Amino acid sequence: MRTVVVKVGGASVAGGALEDLPGVVSGGARVAVVHGGGRQLTRMLDSLGVPTSFREGLRVTDERTLEVAEMVFAGSVNKQLARGLLALGVPAAGVSGTDGPVLRVEPVPGLGRVGRVVAVETRLLETLWGGGFVPVVAPLGLGPRGAYNVNADDAAAALAVALGAGELLLLTDVDGLLRDDEPVPALTPAECERYVSSGVASGGMAPKLRAAAEAARGGVPARIINGGRRGALAGALAGGQVGTLVRQEGAFA
């Protein structure tokens, strides 16, 4: 049975690629959705007067920030996304990476309560699939001091590799990695790293390329697609030229 991991940015499902999910699920694929929610977290922190800062694209997470992150990720964003998928007819079940725990992490030095995934436990997801549900996973992991904030792209890549997924789909707000306003059709992990280190890929694209490269090195092809385009997800899974595909060198022959 085909396994697909889909990473989405936040809670909106209307009018975009996630509207393809009912067909994917009814076609027999085992789908796991991993979500972010950085914008929602920033808005909530601002409203509470909690300062925030970033280092190399990762949010520095102190105890107060983690408390709010759990509230936003495992609470509002996770449940809104699950409800949106339920409205489409997808039997979604919202969980956190700390449940099970699905994601075990080690602390990232200098970033407080930010974790790097070191182990994935798939039993909870297997149980949900066995019951006919689609897991929706919030980007939190369990570490030596309890819960940790985890970059959602990295979490999705680690989950895809652990599950032996057929593909990792990273949804964003552009049509892939763009060069001269056109998506680069295919990259190797080494090429991803060069785009990131050279600064050509910056902002939110850099962590997606790093995550895609990590998945590809683990044997899972990854594709960066526009989550705002209806049909993009189905087209990617059908083998169409959609977005930017990242695979190991030698896999493009």
From Swiss-Prot:
One of the record's GO molecular function terms: acetylglutamate kinase activity
Organism domain of life: Bacteria
Keywords per UniProt: Amino-acid biosynthesis, Arginine biosynthesis, ATP-binding, Cytoplasm, Kinase, Nucleotide-binding, Transferase
UniProt-annotated location(s): Cytoplasm
Keyword match Ion transport: no
Residues at the site labelled Transition state stabilizer: 7, 208
Catalyzed reactions: N-acetyl-L-glutamate + ATP = N-acetyl-L-glutamyl 5-phosphate + ADP
EC number, as in UniProt: 2.7.2.8
Segment forming the signal sequence: none
Biological or metabolic pathway of the protein: Amino-acid biosynthesis; L-arginine biosynthesis; N(2)-acetyl-L-ornithine from L-glutamate: step 2/4
GO biological process: arginine biosynthetic process via ornithine; L-arginine biosynthetic process
Pfam family, one: AA_kinase
InterPro entries found in the cross-reference section: AceGlu_kinase-like_sf, AcgluKinase_fam, ArgB, Asp/Glu/Uridylate_kinase
Chief place where the protein resides: cytoplasm
Family named by the database record: Belongs to the acetylglutamate kinase family. ArgB subfamily.
Annotated function: Catalyzes the ATP-dependent phosphorylation of N-acetyl-L-glutamate.
Name of the protein in its database record: Acetylglutamate kinase
Organism from which the protein derives: Rubrobacter xylanophilus (strain DSM 9941 / JCM 11954 / NBRC 16129 / PRD-1)
Gene for this chain: argB
